[in-house]
Amino acid sequence: MGKAEVRAALGDPSVRLVNALTRKQHAGDGAHYGRPGRIPDSTCVPALMLVQRGTGMFQPLPELRAAVEAAGIKPGQRVITYCGGAIAAACDAFVLTLLGHDDVAIYDGSLAEWSNDLSLPMETG
């Protein structure tokens, strides 16, 4: 999915933007890509929280489901995942698909592209 499609999804309540970076990066603190922060109205489901430390295996299904539900992602909702460069976003997209979500896309350019385009909005905090 490209930048134009993500821009068109802004403000659309039928679409959920999901940032797979850390909560700190989501807030605009710590390491960032271009400008700090996130794409407006996105929620954060850190990819690192979806895997078990040490083994790299995914968390059990009930924990994955709880993380997705806590982020407000509803069944049947279109979801666009992103991160810094689409790697962590692929993890989130896989988990969403595993949990039965069938309308999931990855913003390939992610924040490496979005945050470097000064015409596009960013949020922090």
Protein language model regions, located:
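Rhodanese-like catalytic fold shared by cysteine-dependent sulfurtransferases
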Residues: M1-R16, A20-G125
